[in-house]
UniProtKB/Swiss-Prot annotation:
Record InterPro entries: GTP_cyclohydrolase_FolE2, GTP_cyclohydrolase_FolE2/MptA
Known function: Converts GTP to 7,8-dihydroneopterin triphosphate.
Encoding gene, per UniProt annotation: folE2
Catalytic EC class: hydrolase
Biological pathway: Cofactor biosynthesis; 7,8-dihydroneopterin triphosphate biosynthesis; 7,8-dihydroneopterin triphosphate from GTP: step 1/1
Site (May be catalytically important): 149
Enzyme Commission designation: 3.5.4.16
Name this polypeptide is given: GTP cyclohydrolase FolE2
NCBIfam families to which the protein is assigned, alphabetical: PRK13674.1-1
Gene Ontology molecular function, alphabetical: GTP cyclohydrolase I activity
UniProt family annotation: Belongs to the GTP cyclohydrolase IV family.
Keywords: Hydrolase
Phylogenetic lineage: Bacteria, Pseudomonadati, Pseudomonadota, Betaproteobacteria, Nitrosomonadales
Signal peptide: none
Species in which this protein is naturally found: Nitrosospira multiformis (strain ATCC 25196 / NCIMB 11849 / C 71)
One GO BP annotation of this record: tetrahydrofolate biosynthetic process
C-alpha cells in the first residue's frame, strides 16, 4: 500500500526575496523548574520564541519550537537558558534567535512584627538574544511595592496619600546575579515592601514605615541606580518606577538607563 505524500509548503522557495527578522511562536505556556536560593521551584512560564528567516525560505518549522520545549527537562538557570537559545537557532537552521520566558517567581517572606510567614509572587523575565554567534542575556524583575508621596506628607496635617507601585529592574551582568538579590534591591529602596499576609500589628508597622520613608518615582529610580552603579557584576541596567496614583486617574513614571561599558 502506497503512503500518501504530504506537501511541505513552508519548505518551498519564496520568490519575493525579503528576509524576515523574527518569525516563531508567542504566548506558549510550559511548566519549568527555576533555580533559586533555596534550590529549585516549579512554576509555569510563557514563552516567546523567534528566529530569523532567510529571504529564499517561505516559512519556519513552527512545530520545532514546541518540540524543543518538550525535550528540555533541565532546571533553568542563566547557563541552561543560553544553551536553550543556541539549540533553538541550530534546530531551526537560523542565524539569529530570541527567547523571552516570563514566569511568576515566589519568595517566602516573614511579616515584620507578627512573624507570620507567607509567599510573595514576582514577575520575572529571562530574555535571550543571539546574533552572529554572540549571545546576550537580560534578567528582568517587576517588584510590587508601596510608595508614599513626599509632597502629600509635607502639605498635610495628618497622613499622606500612598499607593501600590511597580519597580522594574532589567540587567545585563558579567557574573551571576540571583533573582532574589534584584528583588531585594527594589524593596530596600521603596517606601515599604509588600507582604502576602499581615496581621494588625504588621499593618501598623508597614504604614508607619512608608510614612517615614516618602519617595517620588524619581527618588526610587535614582536610589536604585546608585546601588546598581556600585555593583561591579552589572554591565548595563534599566530601572523603571510606576506609581498607580491613589488620588489621580493616571500613573507617575520614571526611567533610568545605563550601559556602563559605553560610559
Amino acid at each position: 500500500m502506497n503512503k500518501m505524500l504530504i506537501a511541505d509548503v513552508q519548505s518551498v522557495a519564496d520568490t519575493r526575496r525579503i528576509a524576515i527578522d523574527k518569525a516563531g511562536i508567542r504566548a506558549i505556556r510550559h511548566p519549568v523548574r527555576i533555580m533559586d536560593k533555596a534550590g529549585v521551584q516549579h512554576t509555569v512560564a510563557v514563552f516567546n520564541m523567534y528566529v530569523n528567516l532567510a529571504h529564499h525560505l517561505k516559512g519556519v518549522h513552527m512545530s520545532r519550537f514546541v518540540e524543543m520545549l518538550n525535550e528540555h527537562d533541565s532546571v533553568i538557570s542563566v547557563e541552561t537558558f543560553e544553551k536553550l537559545l543556541i539549540s533553538m537557532v541550530k534546530k531551526l537552521e537560523a542565524e539569529s534567535g530570541d527567547i523571552e520566558m516570563r514566569f511568576p517567581y515566589f519568595i517566602g517572606k516573614t511579616a515584620p512584627v507578627s512573624g507570620i510567614k507567607s509567599l510573595m509572587d514576582y514577575d520575572v523575565t529571562f530574555i535571550g538574544q543571539t546574533r552572529n554567534g554572540e549571545s546576550r542575556f537580560t534578567l528582568k524583575v517587576v517588584v510590587p511595592v508601596t510608595s508614599l508621596c513626599p509632597c502629600s506628607k509635607e502639605v498635610s496635617d495628618d497622613g499622606a496619600h500612598n499607593q501600590r507601585s511597580h519597580i522594574s529592574i532589567s540587567i545585563r551582568a558579567n557574573h551571576f546575579v540571583w533573582i532574589e538579590d534584584l528583588i531585594r534591591i527594589a524593596e530596600d529602596q521603596a517606601s515599604c515592601e509588600l507582604y502576602g499576609l499581615l496581621k494588625r500589628s504588621d499593618e501598623k508597622y508597614v504604614t508607619e514605615k512608608a510614612y517615614g520613608n516618602p519617595k517620588f518615582v524619581e527618588d526610587a529610580v535614582r536610589d536604585i541606580a546608585s546601588v546598581l552603579d556600585r555593583d561591579e557584576r552589572i554591565d548595563a541596567y534599566t530601572v523603571e518606577a510606576e506609581n498607580f496614583e491613589s488620588i489621580h486617574n493616571h500613573s507617575a513614571y520614571a526611567l533610568i538607563e545605563c550601559d556602563k561599558l559605553k560610559n
